[in-house]
């Protein structure tokens, strides 16, 4: 099964690392990156994900996974990484 991954990024180091990881996964068939101030505003980011949200935010398929920590936990849970 292949999935689409979406990352909401501000270009920081954590976003770049998550981008590299998601692009390397064979389960990800399509990768989309949305950048703050290019594809959305910072206000729209916090309106969507909450005032405490951090960059990056990740969605896989139709499911919003969350922050880098939540995404790593999810990927381990589905055995995409060890």
Predicted regions and their residues:
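Thioredoxin-like thiol-disulfide oxidoreductase module
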Residues: 34-52
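Conserved beta-strand scaffold positions in the cores of enzyme catalytic domains, especially
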Residues: 31-33, 64
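Non-catalytic, surface beta->alpha helical segment in thiol-disulfide oxidoreductase systems
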Residues: 60-82
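Local sequence-structure signature of Cys/Sec-based thiol-disulfide redox active-site neighborhoods
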Residues: 1-30
């Amino acid at each position: 099964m292949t999935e689409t991954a979406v990352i909401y990024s501000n270009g920081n180091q954590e976003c770049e690392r998550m981008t590299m990881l998601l692009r390397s996964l064979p389960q990800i068939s399509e990768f989309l990156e949305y950048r703050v101030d290019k594809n959305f505003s910072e206000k729209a980011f916090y309106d969507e994900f909450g005032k405490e949200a951090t960059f990056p935010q990740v969605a896989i398929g139709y499911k919003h996974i969350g922050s880098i920590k939540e995404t790593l936990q999810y990927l381990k849970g589905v055995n995409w990484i060890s």
